[in-house]
């Protein structure tokens, strides 16, 4: 048995480092012939065990060497890159041409564009720019039989058949392996204003979001919320403030701080501070600390959900009542209020499977009752693969399974990811 490209052993698995789509295709054909499972590996920043091997007879396709930016086309505002290219590298390449690739998530220096697309990431600027699917112009993918499908193009208008590449965005690699991407760029705004605001109420935070969204719709790029308990860890203060991080981008210099103060005075807001540009990097570094603090302080049960913004207040009230009634859970909430994505995390006392299962059922049931999604931006992976069958309408779930059976009849690609095989 001779592998089509050089491989190494990592634990019980075999790891291959292809340099192009043809080598990926050869690996997939080899895997079919010798009955190996296939697992693509990007930056390994996935939080739901999406890159965790399950079977000893698995080929890990590591995309480290497929990290080339092929073209930055400033006429058509398109950047084309291999799927192992880091998100940060793509952002820098766009910036060098005074353009912007607006998808931005915390581990941008570690995550790869292929992994970002396979989970359809959102991130810190989804409020204004949407998820990564909104910035894809086309993909190249390798199917489970080794067929290479090239959907790359630079066209704004192209109705020459359905956009089949969309099947591979957000499907976590179970329908095919993304090898290259054509991505949309936009002109970079000249000015960027960042504010750290403290208030004492979730409802006031939501009202402020509505005001800013109506007044600065095209310029409001981020509206992050940090609830009192994580705020107390970040800023060494008593746990009663909500901290908001607001970012406004524009081609015109605006005195947004003056507008904010005027709004606060008219609406009798109790605002403790507004920090404008207190080092933008410092403000965003505090936001990134949230992820590390939840690990540091043992908030081990994590829920990545999204809710309609008008449902947030009632949802939080019900969760707080649940916490108060049970006395074994401590909440740690933060999220992207602007796009409805709530990171709803908990410390469990004592941490037992029974208590964690009880908590999970409550949170997920309440999310669905609130017209939300139980998987906002991290995907399902292996860790949450039971959710699709439980919470998707049965017709939708069966349709997804039919697609999987048709595109990957032997279930070689990411078996048990998204749903249990």
Roles of regions detected by a PLM:
Residues 1, 187, 193, 197-198, ...:
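C-terminal substrate-recognition/cap domain of FAD-linked oxidoreductases
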């Amino acid at each position: 048995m001779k592998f089509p490209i050089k491989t190494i052993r990592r634990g019980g698995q075999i790891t291959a480092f292809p340099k192009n789509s043809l080598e990926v295709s050869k690996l997939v054909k080899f895997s079919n012939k010798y009955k190996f499972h296939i697992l693509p590996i990007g930056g390994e920043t996935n939080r739901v065990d999406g890159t965790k091997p399950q079977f000893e007879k698995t080929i890990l396709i590591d995309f480290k060497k497929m990290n080339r930016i092929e073209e930055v086309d400033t006429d058509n505002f398109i950047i084309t890159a291999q799927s192992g290219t880091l998100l940060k590298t793509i952002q820098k390449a766009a910036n060098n041409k005074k353009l912007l690739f607006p998808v931005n998530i915390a581990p941008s220096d570690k995550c790869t564009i292929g992994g970002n697309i396979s989970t359809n990431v959102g991130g810190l600027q989804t409020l204004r720019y949407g998820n990564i699917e909104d910035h894809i112009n086309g993909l190249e993918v390798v199917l489970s039989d080794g067929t290479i499908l090239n959907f790359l193009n630079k066209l704004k208008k192209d109705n020459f058949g359905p956009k089949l590449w969309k099947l591979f965005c957000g499907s976590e690699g179970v329908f095919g392996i993304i090898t290259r991407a054509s991505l949309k760029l936009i002109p970079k705004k000249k000015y960027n204003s960042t504010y750290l605001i403290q208030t004492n109420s979730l409802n006031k935070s939501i009202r402020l979001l509505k005001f800013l969204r109506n007044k600065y719709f095209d310029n409001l790029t981020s509206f992050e919320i940090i609830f009192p308990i994580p705020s107390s860890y970040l800023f060494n203060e008593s746990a009663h403030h909500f901290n908001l991080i607001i970012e406004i981008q524009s081609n015109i210099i605006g005195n947004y701080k003056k507008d904010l103060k005027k709004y606060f005075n008219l609406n009798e807001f109790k605002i403790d501070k507004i920090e404008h540009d207190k080092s933008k990097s410092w403000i965003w570094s505090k936001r990134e600390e949230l992820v590390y603090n939840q690990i540091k302080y043992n908030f081990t049960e994590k829920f990545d959900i999204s809710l309609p913004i008008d449902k947030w207040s009632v949802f939080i009230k019900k969760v707080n009542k649940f916490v108060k009634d049970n006395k074994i859970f401590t909440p740690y909430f933060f999220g992207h209020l602007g796009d409805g994505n709530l990171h709803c995390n908990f410390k469990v006392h004592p941490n037992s499977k029974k208590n964690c299962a009880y908590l999970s059922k409550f949170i997920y049931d309440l999310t669905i009752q609130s017209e939300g999604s139980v998987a906002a931006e991290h995907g399902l992976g292996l860790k949450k693969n039971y959710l699709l069958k439980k919470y998707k309408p049965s017709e939708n779930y069966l349709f997804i399974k039919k697609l999987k059976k048709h595109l990957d009849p032997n279930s070689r690609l990411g078996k048990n990811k998204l749903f249990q095989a």
